[in-house]
């Protein structure tokens, strides 16, 4: 058993867990971490699915009571039915656009300049969204996910599609998109996490099917370590974020994105890091 490889797997799992649900783009961080650690080969594509699975389990655990109650009430209660429908509606655009354009996006947009640019642009959009909500509190019309309409859900789902561009951040696109549509910071974050469950599961199953030829029992210990570390780090991160947003904005994440994007550009242009995008 290669101990160094297991340590690298743990680091990648930690990066995934800490960045998947924050508005800072797990994809961008995984590309950089994978390059630095030498985890950017073909098997790395399947490994990314494994660590993403850990993150999925984490969000399911955090929201398990709500998920369980919704499933139990689904046959009889309209509120549960509407909530489930909203998640489904928000999920559909990513499926359609992902199937249509996913391959082309991966072929042409996974470059250092694109990743860094979306980091920076996303940071300024977060600053704008936060200042807009601060200056006009009346713009917040939805304070919980149960109050969302199907049209609200569709718009958040369309915002999620922006995350197909590497460096955007799925959680960032859905949370900030939701806030710009009138959701409170808490409601937007909650709905983003609920939407993550079908989105990440769907993307993972599809990617696993495409890359099934790369699967090997020899890689199982590496995948298991990455998955477990991703699960625990994502669980801690989600719980921390839900407490954090109760009294803080996303401004700190915006500045982090901008600085990180500048660093990526600088390292790419200077040749200090050869990105395997």
From Swiss-Prot:
Q: Name one GO biological process term.
A: response to antibiotic
Looking at the Swiss-Prot or TrEMBL record, what is one Pfam family this protein matches? BacA
* The protein's role, per its UniProt record: Catalyzes the dephosphorylation of undecaprenyl diphosphate (UPP). Confers resistance to bacitracin.
Q: Which InterPro entries match?
A: UppP
Question: Main location per UniProt?
Answer: membrane
* Subcellular location per the Swiss-Prot or TrEMBL entry: Cell inner membrane
> What's in the misc comment field?
Bacitracin is thought to be involved in the inhibition of peptidoglycan synthesis by sequestering undecaprenyl diphosphate, thereby reducing the pool of lipid carrier available.
Q: Mind telling me what this protein is named?
A: Undecaprenyl-diphosphatase
Q: Give the organism the record lists.
A: Albidiferax ferrireducens (strain ATCC BAA-621 / DSM 15236 / T118)
Membrane spanning stretches? 3-23, 43-63, 85-105, 109-129, 189-209, 218-238, 249-269
